[in-house]
């Protein structure tokens, strides 16, 4: 009787919420991105008995952000030097390996199957090519697109030969027979436009396009200069797309325009940048939009998955969509009309004094309590990690800086919180849809901006040295590297969890390739627009460049992993257009500002302000109140200095949650611990140390009535001032990560 009742209860919950309890067939678990699962066996009482059931080693030292897809008893993961691996979750054996997919969408893939189940596909982007793999065999589908792939550089209204980057790190969203896809064209001047496109999952044919930078005659065209559509870029969807399957509506958090921090060549509100955009998923027709930042100058693009919930307010039920942002704001709208559920007020903000710039005079501020700190004060400094002398210097520096979240970047320093990666970011939202509760991960992370002029950016001025560099050049390169590259790649060039080692990179690439990577970004690396060609050349010298770079034929081939390899490399990128430079000047005849300005991201000080640095938050949107908030993780360096309940610097970045029907919220954290919180009050009910830290979203599947939680633990731990540690509390060899799977004890 109890088992029957539990099964009936689970079935009713499943039907009521639309959650998927037994599989994880999409990035984020389901089209609605709620991460909500029905788990009759996992309760507040039983969770204390949760234990590691098994682990799949990635057999490499790569840090993955991959969210596994689990469907029909098969788990698909990225492992073994960026290979797609299919694993039978019952036998835990590899079914097939498609090896060496370097450049694949690193956060996840898309799964689709035909109604009769005979055609099952994995769809992903690799090096700007959309392609498909047979989910049963692991082999590329040659009939998809043109010779097995669709070149995403095409159909953007620009010369494909000049587009260096389009592929997004997030996989998109499947709806019926369509794959709705965003992009990541880069964040520098003259990046490609971020059109949203939908492709037929069987043929690869382009089904519809939505121009996020409107063209003449389209709605929003008048919010830009008349020729901006010819040169402006970004306004892309690199974050997480949410789908209301019943209504056929796709909700897209649209990114900021380029260049991020100076907009004299894009005067106006700049629709549809920084919008929550609702599109008809079948046709791409705009249903409604709301712009959360006008004329963005702060890289405040929304990226977190919009959450679909039912709110009880004013005596009625409202099907709502919720967008959490980097600023710590929470916006709530009626799903069908876009009407705000909780009030939003346009408030005056500071004007810009930078030549040519026209900051928008107001910004839309929601009435709901922010989840993040929004002002930097001299008294907010951390009690950890910095000396008294450093503290005094920081107090003076912050006291002189311009502050306030919407203070435009200027020729003097601005101290902004949340910064470019603060607040709530991708992976950081989940919900109990039926109860109107949204769960958020948040971090307080300031940015320090200071604009500078940049003029020597012509390709002809680049220094591609083929001889030894002098001492002055090496010293300039060392300084430029430490200021602009050291945080991610390490001052010693040995790498950090944020970026790979560069110890041998100087002998592998030349000035043109380094310049393209710096200006336009590559994979998870953002563009660094403030460096001149001279500085890039100096950095190359510091990295050991000077001799001729090795040709691709001289580079070592990627090793073939052990196991049932059925294919390798996917569909290779066509070798055409490899030497064509992206544009560095505006089209002829267009009136543009005489000067360009740049700044770095100012992200070198994640620990600077007093903790908590990272938090998990439960927001009750029926009442419009924060129900509870708790620190997320514990920084071990701070703990050594007596700190408790501090969170971790960068502690919520690239982390994710699972919400259960039984009142649990599981969350990963940068300290390499998986936590189970009580959904009602935030108490920690259980935790487990992982062999390595995590990046990316966890997943859930069910087998024989037991639910299994899958966590991608492949990233070295970092604490406080970027000290590193791995293998905490683990029997696994140090530095060996993998997918760790937890479950309640089974029959022995």
What are these regions (language model features)?
Residues 6-16:
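Bacterial N-terminal signal peptides
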Residues 20-60, 67-70, 616-619:
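Mature N-terminal segment immediately following signal peptide/propeptide cleavage
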Residues 21-42, 360-391, 395, 554-595:
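N-terminal pre-domain segments of enzymes
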Residues 24-28, 61-81, 103-130, 164-190, ...:
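Repeat-blade elements of multi-bladed beta-propeller folds
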Residues 31-37, 61-65, 85, 260-261, ...:
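Short, solvent-exposed loop/turn elements at domain surfaces
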Residues 45-59, 84-104, 116, 130-162, ...:
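Extracytoplasmic/lumenal domain signature
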Residues 167, 249, 466-557, 561-572, ...:
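Extracytoplasmic electron-transfer domains, predominantly the class I c-type cytochrome c fold
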Residues 380-395, 403-409, 416-417, 427-470, ...:
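Periplasmic c-type cytochrome electron-transfer domains
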């Amino acid at each position: 009787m109890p088992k029957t009742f539990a099964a009936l209860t689970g079935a009713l919950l499943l039907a009521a919420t639309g959650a998927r309890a037994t599989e994880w067939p999409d990035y984020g678990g389901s089209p609605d991105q709620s991460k909500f699962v029905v788990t009759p066996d996992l309760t507040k009482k039983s969770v204390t008995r949760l234990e590691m059931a098994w682990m799949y080693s990635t057999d490499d030292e790569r840090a993955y952000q991959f969210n596994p897809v689990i469907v029909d008893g098969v788990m698909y993961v990225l492992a073994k030097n960026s290979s797609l691996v299919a694993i039978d979750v019952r036998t835990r054996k590899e079914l097939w390996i498609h090896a060496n997919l370097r450049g694949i969408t690193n956060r996840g893939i898309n799964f689709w199957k035909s109604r009769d189940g005979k055609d099952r596909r994995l769809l992903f982007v690799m090096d700007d090519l959309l392609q498909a793999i047979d989910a049963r065999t692991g082999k590329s589908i040659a009939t998809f697109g043109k010779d097995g792939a669709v070149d995403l550089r095409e159909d953007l209204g620009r010369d494909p030969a000049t587009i260096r980057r389009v592929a997004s790190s997030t996989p998109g969203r499947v709806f019926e027979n369509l794959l709705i896809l965003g992009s990541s064209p880069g964040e520098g001047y003259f990046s490609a436009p971020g059109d949203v496109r939908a492709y037929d999952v069987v043929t690869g044919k382009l089904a519809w396009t939505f121009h996020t930078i409107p063209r003449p005659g389209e709605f929003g065209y008048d919010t830009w200069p008349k020729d901006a559509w010819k040169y402006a870029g970004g306004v892309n969807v690199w974050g997480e797309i949410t789908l209301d399957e019943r209504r056929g509506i796709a909700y897209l958090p649209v990114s900021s325009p380029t260049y991020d921090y100076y907009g004299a060549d894009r005067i106006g509100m700049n629709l549809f940048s920084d919008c929550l955009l609702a599109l008809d998923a079948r046709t791409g027709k705009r249903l409604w939009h709301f712009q959360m930042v006008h004329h963005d100058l702060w890289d405040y693009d929304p990226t977190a998955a919009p959450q679909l919930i039912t709110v009880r307010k004013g005596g009625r039920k409202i099907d709502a969509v919720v967008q959490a942002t980097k600023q710590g704001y929470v916006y709530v709208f009626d799903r069908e009309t876009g009407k705000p559920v909780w009030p939003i007020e346009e408030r005056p903000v500071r004007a810009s004094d930078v030549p040519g710039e026209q900051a928008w005079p107001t910004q839309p501020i929601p009435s709901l309590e922010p989840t993040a700190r929004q002002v930097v004060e001299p008294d907010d400094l951390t009690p950890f990690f910095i000396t008294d002398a450093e503290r005094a210097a920081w107090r003076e520096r912050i006291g002189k800086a311009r502050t306030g979240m919407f203070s435009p970047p200027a020729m003097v320093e601005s101290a902004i919180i949340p910064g470019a990666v603060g607040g709530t970011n991708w992976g950081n939202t989940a919900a109990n849809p039926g109860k109107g509760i949204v769960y958020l991960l948040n971090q307080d992370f300031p940015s320090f901006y200071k604009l500078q002029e940049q003029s020597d950016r012509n390709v002809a001025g680049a220094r591609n040295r083929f001889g030894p560099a002098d001492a002055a050049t090496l010293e300039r390169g060392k300084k430029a590297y430490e200021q602009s590259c050291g945080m991610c790649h390490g001052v010693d060039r040995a790498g950090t969890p944020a970026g790979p080692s560069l110890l041998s990179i100087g002998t592998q690439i030349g000035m043109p390739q380094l310049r393209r990577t710096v200006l336009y970004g590559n994979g998870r690396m953002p563009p660094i627009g403030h460096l001149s060609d001279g500085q890039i050349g100096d950095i190359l010298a510091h990295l050991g460049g000077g001799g001729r770079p090795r040709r691709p034929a001289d580079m070592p081939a990627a090793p073939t992993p052990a196991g049932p390899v059925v294919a390798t490399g996917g569909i290779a990128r066509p070798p055409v257009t490899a030497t064509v430079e992206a544009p560095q000047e505006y089209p002829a005849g267009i009136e543009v500002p005489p000067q360009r300005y740049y700044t770095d991201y100012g992200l070198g000080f994640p620990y600077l302000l007093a903790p908590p640095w990272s938090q998990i938050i439960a927001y009750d949107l029926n009442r419009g109140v924060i129900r509870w908030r708790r620190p997320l993780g514990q920084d071990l360096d701070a703990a050594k200095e007596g700190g408790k309940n501090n969170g971790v610097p960068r502690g919520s970045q690239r982390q994710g949650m699972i919400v259960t029907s039984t009142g649990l919220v599981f969350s990963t954290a940068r300290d390499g611990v998986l936590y189970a919180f009580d959904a009602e009050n935030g108490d920690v009910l259980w935790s487990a140390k992982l062999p390595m830290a995590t990046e990316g979203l966890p997943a859930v599947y069910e087998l024989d009535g037991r639910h299994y939680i899958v966590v991608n633990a492949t990233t070295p731990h970092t604490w406080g001032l970027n000290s590193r540690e791995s293998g905490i509390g683990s029997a696994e060899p140090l530095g060996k990560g993998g997918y760790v799977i937890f479950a309640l004890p089974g029959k022995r």
